[in-house]
A protein has these predicted regions:
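Typically the conserved alpha-helix immediately C-terminal to a functionally engaged Cys/Sec
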Residues: 61-75, 93-97
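Thiol-based oxidoreductase modules, predominantly thioredoxin-like and allied folds used
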Residues: 76-92, 104-115
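Short, internal strand/loop/helix patches
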Residues: 96-135
């Protein structure tokens, strides 16, 4: 049996200096029209946490993740954005209806087309989910299929209480 790790017998001093904490990043300003023609923008969420869920109508594995987030996040706290402006996928009402049919239940979340916002947040995989704290800073980014509802709940609760100091560092 071979165990990886420290195998040297001689004692070594390890620098235990501080770890640089990344600066908080503000979620970009945005505005979109939802699948039901409602106008939405970031100012509607001033002093409130929310989740920005980026996906595409053709992403099959994204539906199970969307289902998990939808099951646990409070009403009105998740926006679903598509980055794909291709004519075949730009109908948000069709995407909303297809998702409801596939999940066999009502999804009471706004579905919005916003490729520039996807680019602004650096979306590089699907799904791409950002948890935004009440001050408008991105607290957590979750990339790829993620269906652990307990973990999503914990991330949401942490996001709601996440605080940024005056230097832009997470406390």
């Amino acid at each position: 049996m071979f165990l990886s790790g420290c195998t040297a017998e001689e004692e070594q001093l390890i620098d235990e200096g501080g770890i640089e904490v990344p600066l908080a990043t503000a979620f970009p300003n945005w505005s979109s029209t939802s699948h039901d023609s409602s106008e939405m923008n970031n100012s509607m969420f001033e002093n409130e946490s929310y989740v920005a869920y980026f996906s595409a109508p053709w992403c099959g594995h994204c539906e199970s993740s969307l289902d998990a987030y939808d099951q646990v996040l409070p009403e009105g706290k998740m926006m679903i954005f598509s980055y794909d402006a291709d004519e075949d996928y730009s109908d948000m009402n069709a995407w909303h209806n297809k998702t409801e049919t596939n999940l066999n239940r009502t999804i009471d979340r706004p579905f919005m087309l916003n490729p520039p916002l996807a680019q602004a947040v650096g979306m590089n995989s699907l799904p791409f989910v950002l948890f935004v704290n009440p001050d408008g800073f991105v607290y957590h980014v979750q990339v790829g299929k993620f269906t652990d509802q307990d973990a999503i709940t914990n991330l949401w609760q942490s996001t709601e209480s996440a605080i940024v100091d005056e230097d832009g560092r997470w406390l």
